[in-house]
C-alpha cells in the first residue's frame, strides 16, 4: 500500500502543481501521514482526474486490482473528472472494471467527456451517478495520421473499427440503439446531469449523500 500511495502521490502532485493535502492519523503506534488520495484509497475511493493516458490508466487499473484483492465483495467508487483522452488507455481501465469481481460505482464530478463519459457509463448497473452541475459529452473517436496512402487506409479502417466497438458498448450500457448512438456521436454531444440520466449514461443525479439511518 505504501508503494502504491507513493506512486499515486507523485502523480497527483504533478497534476495539481505540488499541492496535495496530507492527512495525519493517530494510532496505537503513533502518527501516520497519508496524502489525501491514499487515505481515500483505504476507503475504496479512486480518483480519475485529468486526461486519460497510459500512465494514469496503469495507476487506475492497479488500484482496482489492489482493492479487489483486499475485498472482492465490497464496492469500489471511481470518481471521474476528465476531458477524455486515449482510447487504448481508457479501454484498459474499462476492461479492468469489467474484469474484477467488485462492482465499480462511477461518479462524475465536474466533467466526464469522451473516454471519461464512456468510463462513467461503464460502471455497475444502478451505481452510475453524477453531481448536479456536472457535464458529460460523447463523440466519435478522433484520429489523425500522416504517411503513405496505404498506411493512411490501414489507420482509417482501425479508427472505424474502434468507433463501432465503442458505439456498441455505449449502446449496451445506455440502453440506446446502436443507430441512435452512431447518430448522437457524429459531433460533440454535451449533456446536462438530467439529460445524461434520461439518456442512460448514468442512473441518477446525486444532490446530497444519503447518510445511514
Swiss-Prot record:
Enzyme class: hydrolase
Residues annotated as the enzyme's active site: 114 (nucleophile), 139
One Gene Ontology molecular-function label: serine-type endopeptidase activity
UniProt key word Protease: yes
Record-given protein name: ATP-dependent Clp protease proteolytic subunit
Listed GO CC annotations: cytoplasm; endopeptidase Clp complex
Subcellular localization(s) per the UniProt record: Cytoplasm
Similarity comment text for this entry: Belongs to the peptidase S14 family.
